[in-house]
Amino acid sequence: MMSAFKPLLEARGLNAWYDRSHVVQDIAFEVRAGEIVTLMGRNGAGKTTTLRTLMGLLAKASGEVLFEGRPLQGQPAHARFHAGLAYVPEDRRIVAGLTVRENLQLGIIASPSRGEMDARIDEIAETFPRLKERLAQEATSMSGGEQQMLAIARAMMARPKMILLDEPSEGIMPVLVDEMFELFARMKGQGTTILLVEQNVERALSISDRAYILDQGRIVHQAGAQALLADEDIQSRYCAV
């Protein structure tokens, strides 16, 4: 079992390009097991591209990604998912025409028995109580916030060691934002490591252990979450939308 003091995920010298634009430039950071770490910065700073690079989703990228000490470079996204690294993009990718339960079933890697599948869905429903009474509902008939929770729940079906979340509170009603951040704290308590990209700086830092700030594709600052929460100068300089 990995020590909480050793990195679960390490990024070394990450670079990424869109056409000729060098969007992520020589980024290096780590996330330890059991942490919530937030990537912060203005729009266009390179946060989402960093997540996509970690998942092997960009054709033009370089650098090393280590997960549990093992290199991931050269492996496609599905292999990284099998290794225990999950990713929920901002667009959610909920499958229309399927129920909440059927969407959850898509998150299972193996081929469990019906009883095992039902048991896992019941476990997930306890962690995501808003979905519990909606399992038979057509998934895209739910609100955007509920669909976001479904996307996260689906990623959690395979019991990943770590999950990458891209702007989970974007466009969601405040009451659901509160519920979502309570959910992230609950997931951490259950042993899930989280790397979070989030524009809601105050809420993200309130549940995070540490944060890295990106500006123009580079990490320009890192600190404990509480120190950053108290540093209004850094927030206004790098994190205002």
Short names for language-model regions:
Residues 63-72, 83, 117-121, 223:
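Conserved ABC transporter NBD signature motif
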Residues 19, 60, 75, 100-119, ...:
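ABC-type ATPase nucleotide-binding domains, specifically the catalytic core motifs of the NBD
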Residues 40-42:
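The feature captures the beta-strand-to-loop junction immediately N-terminal to the Walker
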Residues 155-156:
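ABC ATPase C-loop
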Residues 55:
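Helix-to-loop junction immediately C-terminal to a conserved catalytic motif
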Residues 159:
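Conserved catalytic motifs of ABC-family nucleotide-binding domains
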